[in-house]
Amino acid sequence: MKLTFFGRLRDQVGTGEIDCSPPANVDDSESLRLWIGGQHSALLDPTVRIALDDILVSGPTPIADVVEVAFLPPVSGG
């Protein structure tokens, strides 16, 4: 599974992409956030959005067949 990070998250994580194999008990988007957030606390921010294979999700969503998980910082505008 590929994890990608955009904007300030890329800076806070220190890279734009990580290849990983989550443990078996990490089976949805929220458990993945908690698992990787243990290493990169910026990802625990509830305003960070998650996209699974280019589809924004909210709440726990299964990740069994997902190839890419993107972590997106909040967008500001004016």
PLM region descriptions:
Residues M1-G77:
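Ubiquitin-like/PB1-type beta-grasp interaction modules and other compact soluble beta-rich domains
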